[in-house]
Amino acid sequence: MLTREQAHELLDLCFDINGDEKRKRSKTGELPTTFFRFSGHVNNIEIDVHEKGWDRDIYPEKCFAIWLAETYGDTYEGVKDYLFQLKKMTAELALETVKQHDIDYMSMSVLYHRKEVLSNDIFKQ
């Protein structure tokens, strides 16, 4: 089962991972891409994750399904923990991308606009 607040939290984590720009391999390399879908007719949420970036004809590495009023499917805690870890890895990968391609700090926000996700230690490197 999933509350509305928990659904919003999962959506926020997907935005933290994706940013709000288009995300596909040709633009952002291997930064993860998330897909978040709510199906009102069955009252469930599905989250697909392309861990190495989205590209045509490539299936997601992870697919989650959570029902708002049922007890089957994936658990909120399990999906949240996975997305939180992916969010941290995305922050580190975005910084590595910036370092490898000698992109200035302002350009980094295009790759990953949620800089508050990155810890101060990562920015000091």
Regions found by a protein language model. Name each.
Residues 1-44, 53-125:
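Negatively charged, low-complexity tracts enriched in Asp/Glu with abundant Ser/Thr
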Residues 50:
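An extracellular/secretory-lumen and virion-surface interaction module
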